[in-house]
């Protein structure tokens, strides 16, 4: 869904069009071993349903760890996890750190502002140096789409890479935790109508969610938003597009709200935040148009009074905080699975 491309240099360049995503220098599926096992998690696109379900099933086993007096299992004891966040994050970085710690891994958070990359060192030189320190797993967030693919191609063979968000392209662990949340409350994906609302054009979460939902057999995925914030190509993916929020919400079982990604916008795509809320904000009245037992989700950070009303965010149908809780178990599952697979 995005044509952001990556050069073979240390500083990937993001192109403007969001319609396709291809890396011509990669052969086959770079996420999988020769035996079809998950070695890296770079995108949900192209993953077999069996692998997605395996991650969700494994996460279900880890949820109970949170309730233990000692919140640890020894799965990654002796392994080193490097969190490489070239783009700011609070929620994602923290949950990855907690997840790795609960797996008994040694965790290092690279201070990008104080690292050699801020002094002109290329991305690949940084990765090669960290690989030489016998890192086992890189968790990477980068502003340029494709950066985790570049790292996965060039890192040492023993290193595993998890994409924690790259540009507008993908946020696979968020997509997986969203799927876990939906499965927890709704169980059967094949009977659901799911609406994704808001700034889909700039949202890597939306892309990952759409790929995950279609992979898991959801029969109706709706994209709802203003024309200026919807990418092309949605219909070709089997997504129903709505430019009216009230129409799009009718009868849906799951609502995934997205914030406005102002930091990724170039030019004025909307009149104002206040006007946006009047037309596109999820209020109790609009929520009533959905199925009576519909759940409301949000990947965060959440902007109250812009895309969602506080009464909805804090209401009985909101599962937003549970998404955060489930996210730890899902990231534990992903790290545990990839670290156990190698060519």
Curated annotation (Swiss-Prot):
The UniProt entry's GO CC annotations, sorted and at most eight, read: cytosol
Supply the EC number(s).
Answer: 2.1.3.2
> Which intervals of the chain form a coiled coil?
none
SUPFAM superfamilies, per database record: Aspartate/ornithine carbamoyltransferase
Kindly state a single biological-process term from the GO annotations of this entry.
Answer: 'de novo' UMP biosynthetic process
- At which positions is carbamoyl phosphate bound? 91-92, 141, 171, 174, 300-301
Note the Gene3D superfamilies from the entry.
Aspartate/ornithine carbamoyltransferase
State the top-level EC class. Answer: transferase
Which pathway does it take part in? Pyrimidine metabolism; UMP biosynthesis via de novo pathway; (S)-dihydroorotate from bicarbonate: step 2/3
Spell out the reaction equation it catalyses.
Answer: carbamoyl phosphate + L-aspartate = N-carbamoyl-L-aspartate + phosphate + H(+)
**From what superkingdom does this record's organism come?**
Bacteria
Enumerate the InterPro entries for this protein. Asp/Orn_carbamoyltranf_P-bd, Asp/Orn_carbamoylTrfase, Asp/Orn_carbamoylTrfase_sf, Asp_carbamoyltransf, Asp_carbamoyltransf_Asp/Orn-bd
Q: Which residues bind L-aspartate?
A: 119, 204, 259
Q: What's a Gene Ontology MF term here? A: aspartate carbamoyltransferase activity
Q: Keywords, A to Z?
A: Pyrimidine biosynthesis, Transferase
Query: According to its UniProt record, which protein family does this protein belong to?
Result: Belongs to the aspartate/ornithine carbamoyltransferase superfamily. ATCase family.
Annotated function: Catalyzes the condensation of carbamoyl phosphate and aspartate to form carbamoyl aspartate and inorganic phosphate, the committed step in the de novo pyrimidine nucleotide biosynthesis pathway.
The subunit structure is: Heterododecamer (2C3:3R2) of six catalytic PyrB chains organized as two trimers (C3), and six regulatory PyrI chains organized as three dimers (R2).
Q: What is this protein called?
A: Aspartate carbamoyltransferase catalytic subunit
The organism that produces this protein has a lineage beginning with:
Bacteria, Pseudomonadati, Pseudomonadota, Betaproteobacteria, Burkholderiales
């Amino acid at each position: 869904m995005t044509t952001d491309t990556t050069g073979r240099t240390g500083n990937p360049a993001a192109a403007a069009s969001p319609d396709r995503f291809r890396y011509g220098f990669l052969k086959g599926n770079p996420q999988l071993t020769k035996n079809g096992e998950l070695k890296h998690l770079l995108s949900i696109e192209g993953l077999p349903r069996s692998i997605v379900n395996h991650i969700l099933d494994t996460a279900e086993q880890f949820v109970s760890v949170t309730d233990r007096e000692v919140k640890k299992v020894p799965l990654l004891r002796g392994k080193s996890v490097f969190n490489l966040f070239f783009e700011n994050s609070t929620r994602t970085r923290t949950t990855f750190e907690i997840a790795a710690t609960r797996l008994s891994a040694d965790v290092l958070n690279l201070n990008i502002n104080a690292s050699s990359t801020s002094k002109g060192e290329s991305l690949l030189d940084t990765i090669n140096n960290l690989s030489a320190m016998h890192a086992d797993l890189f968790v990477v967030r980068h502003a340029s789409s494709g950066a985790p693919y570049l790292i996965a191609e060039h890192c040492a063979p023993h290193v595993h890479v998890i994409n924690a968000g790259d540009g507008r392209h993908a946020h696979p662990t968020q997509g997986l935790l969203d799927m876990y949340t939906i499965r927890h409350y709704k169980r059967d994906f094949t009977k659901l109508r799911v609406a994704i609302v808001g700034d889909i054009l700039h949202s890597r979460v939306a892309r990952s969610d759409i790929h995950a939902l279609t992979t898991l057999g959801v029969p109706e995925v709706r994209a709802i938003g203003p024309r200026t914030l919807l990418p092309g190509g949605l219909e070709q993916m089997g997504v129903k597009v709505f430019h009216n929020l009230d129409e799009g919400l009718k009868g849906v079982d799951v609502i995934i709200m997205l914030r406005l990604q102002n930091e990724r916008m170039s030019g004025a795509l909307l009149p104002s935040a206040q006007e946006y809320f009047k037309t596109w904000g999820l209020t109790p009245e609009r929520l009533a148009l959905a199925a009576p037992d519909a759940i409301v989700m949000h990947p965060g950070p959440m902007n109250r009074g812009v895309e969602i009303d506080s009464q909805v965010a804090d209401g009985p149908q909101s599962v937003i905080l549970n998404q955060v809780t489930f996210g730890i178990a899902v990231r534990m599952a992903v790290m545990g699975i990839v670290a156990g697979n190698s060519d």
